[in-house]
Design a protein with these regions (language model features):
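Positively charged n-region of N-terminal signal peptides that target proteins for export
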Residues: 1-4
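Bacterial N-terminal signal peptides
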Residues: 7-14
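Protease-domain processing segments flanking chymotrypsin-fold serine proteases, especially trypsin-like
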Residues: 15-73, 94, 281, 285-297
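Serine endopeptidase catalytic core focused on the charge-relay Asp
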Residues: 25-27, 45-57, 66, 71-74, ...
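C-terminal subregion of chymotrypsin/trypsin-like serine protease catalytic domains
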Residues: 81, 100, 209-210, 218-220, ...
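Low-complexity, disordered linker/stalk regions enriched in Pro/Thr/Ser/Gly
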Residues: 287-507
Length: 507
């Protein structure tokens, strides 16, 4: 397999899947399709406290109540950090947000069932109590409504699990994916599968430790922030990303990789969730209280700047080696390839200037671990370096559309494998794509006048690291084909839609 948050919302970044929509779970069978929840007869009332979050991205969030919270206290909701933070900013790998105001337009829509839309309950988000994408991808939001007000309306928090689900045991996710569903079905859905294992993952800028893995079906953009529940309907994790829309093993956005020995592996069609068992230990009378029993990183952190792009090549366009340029104040550090290093182990941290030598030459993912002296070893700042010198092998798809004046075309992006294009065209007779001068595609459709048909179109893809693939040729005739789809609408062979970042990141 050649190289590739939930909603991160926006996250934008169109990728398309090259995998089958069916995938085997740990029991050897296939996960059940998700079910649209209906509540006209209160059959799903226990999930009325799960809803559509409209914040920095469109996600899922759910009511979560600290122990001892007073009835008059403002209610809280849980979701992913990437649903409220500017996740395209690399500072999210070390920034911790505590007690920040929320946009006046943000809201959580509860009672979010397809058959009782008139009973929906929109609640304004008052503040961001906590948000992080460092080590964990979680956010705690304060609502304008109190616990007493919500519970009087039949909106109750999900019960908190005291232990994580065991591998092989049944679980379920409840969320509001947008995905491929028609608008009338973009409401709460339940998907069932089994808990598989715990793994640490790397995705683009971020590293997340000890996530829960499952194969529940129909996890799409909008699913970010969905609760993951055990057989007793107790929440133990929060869904944050999926490889179901991944197209390569580059560990890029939308292509999470598991950190194994040696190196990273993208396992197709897997979902990953943040553990929240022990989250109650982070609150004292609904006030944040960081400590050794709290599984959230505190605001004391190591910031850095001047990190390499992801992915990158170890040399520049002229073939000159690239060097480490990362800068961080008062940091101890260590560096190594995924599988060879554990950033959470205090051993081997160096008390010397940060590296300035050449980047490693071998393809793979490397971690530069940063810590402060005597800091909590559970939550290092991690700078991800992804090196890739492999040319993309995917053949670009063209979107064609005809008019009385001729034919226009544009290549279809599949980030990160096909992030840039070089294009050209000439007469079908006598044009060789190997010798034709190609120019950068500027994201403006290219027109071929009907007088120049039939024509030969030549396209070369370039991946996000700057590696160019083979040149492909496409012959276009003067006759309009019987079926040419509108621009940017040509489907994948798999029938799946491009991933947007809700990361479910499209996400």
């Amino acid at each position: 397999m050649h190289r590739s948050f939930l909603f991160m919302i926006a996250a934008l970044f169109a990728c398309q899947s090259s995998y089958s929509s069916k995938f085997q779970n740990e029991e050897g069978g296939f996960p059940e399709p998700s079910v649209l929840l209906k509540n006209a007869h209160e059959a799903a009332q226990s999930f009325a406290g799960v809803g559509r979050l409209q914040a920095a991205m469109s996600c899922t969030a759910f009511l979560w109540k600290p122990e001892g919270a007073r009835p008059e206290a403002k209610a809280l909701a849980l979701t992913n950090g990437h649903c409220v933070m500017p996740y395209t900013d690399r500072a999210t790998t070390y920034d911790i947000w505590v007690n920040r105001p929320a946009s006046s337009e943000w809201k959580l829509i509860l009672n979010y069932f397809a058959d009782t839309t008139e009973a929906q309950k929109p609640i304004v988000i008052q503040s961001i109590v906590y948000a992080s994408m460092k080590a964990v991808d979680l956010a705690v939001l304060e609502l304008q409504a109190s616990w007493a007000e919500l519970e009087a309306a039949g909106l109750k928090p999900l019960p908190q699990a005291l232990k994580s689900a065991k591998a092989g045991f049944p679980i379920r996710t409840v969320g509001a994916p947008l995905g491929p569903f028609p608008y009338a079905e973009q409401f709460l859905r339940e998907a069932r599968c089994v808990e598989e294992t715990r793994v640490s993952i790397v995705e683009w800028y971020w590293t997340w430790f000890d996530t829960h893995r499952n194969s529940c079906a129909d996890i799409h953009e909008g699913s970010s922030g969905s609760p993951v529940l055990n057989a007793q309907n107790e929440v133990f994790a929060v869904l944050n990303t999926t490889s179901a829309t991944g197209i390569s093993d580059s560990c890029y956005l939308g292509n999470p990789c598991e950190m194994q020995r040696p190196g990273t592996v993208m396992v197709a069609n897997k979902n990953y969730a943040m553990d929240i068992v022990g989250l109650q230990e982070c609150f004292d009378d609904q006030t944040l209280a960081f400590g050794s029993d709290c599984p959230l990183p505190g605001p004391e952190t190591v910031a850095y700047r001047d990190a390499p792009a992801i992915p990158t090549r170890p040399v520049d366009r002229q073939g000159q080696p690239l060097h480490w340029t990362v800068q961080a104040e008062n940091a101890i550090w260590k560096m190594g390839a995924v599988g060879d290093i554990d950033c959470r182990d205090d051993d081997d941290y160096r008390r010397e200037p940060l590296p300035t030598g050449e980047l490693p030459q071998e393809n793979g993912v490397y971690l530069l671990c940063l810590q402060k002296e005597d800091a909590d070893e559970r939550f290092p700042t991690v700078v991800v370096l992804s090196l890739d010198t492999r040319p993309p092998t995917l053949k670009p798809e063209l979107s064609l559309w005809y008019s009385e004046r001729g034919v226009s075309f544009e290549p279809i992006f599949k980030v990160p494998e096909l992030s840039f294009f070089w294009v050209g065209f000439g007469p079908q007779e006598g044009t060789s794509c190997e010798t034709l001068k190609l120019t950068p595609y500027r994201r403006i459709p290219i027109h071929v006048d009907k007088r120049n048909l039939p024509a030969r179109i030549c396209v070369q893809g370039e991946d996000h690291a700057g590696n160019r693939g083979p040149i492909f040729s496409y012959d276009v005739n003067a006759e309009e084909p019987s079926r040419v789809l509108p621009r940017n609408m040509r489907p994948e062979a798999s029938g799946q839609k491009p991933k947007k970042h809700d990361v479910i990141r499209k996400q």
